Amino acid sequence: MTVNLHDSAYDLEQALRQSEEYSRLKNLYDEVNGDPSAKKMFDNFRDIQLNLQQKQMNGEDITQEEVEQAQKSVALVQQHEKISQLMEAEQRMSMLIADLNKIIMKPLEELYGNPES
């Protein structure tokens, strides 16, 4: 029996969309985006985060001022209940996807060996 991996991937996509983790993430995301003040705060946090990630990927130095700005932004969004809940839901979704990736990569790790072991 031949398995169509793309069909399996689309099934996994649908399962992810129907999961409790995704539902909670989407609801919290919609709530944050429905509140103009929270949306502005969250967008600012994301912009700072993406800017720092881009600099790291480009091998650029991150200034102390940028580090302090990022720390202030994190402290600010963590004080906002809905944004804090959204960030927790994002973390749970990220861990779920990492677990799924481990499962998907298992045949290749078995074939080639796991370099981390």
Swiss-Prot record:
UniProt-listed Pfam families: Com_YlbF
Transmembrane segments: none
Secretion signal, residue range per the UniProt entry: none
Gene3D superfamilies hit by this protein: YheA/YmcA-like
Chain segments annotated as coiled-coil in the UniProt record: none
Family assignment from sequence similarity: Belongs to the UPF0342 family.
Protein name in the entry: UPF0342 protein BLi01058/BL02870
Organism: Bacillus licheniformis (strain ATCC 14580 / DSM 13 / JCM 2505 / CCUG 7422 / NBRC 12200 / NCIMB 9375 / NCTC 10341 / NRRL NRS-1264 / Gibson 46)
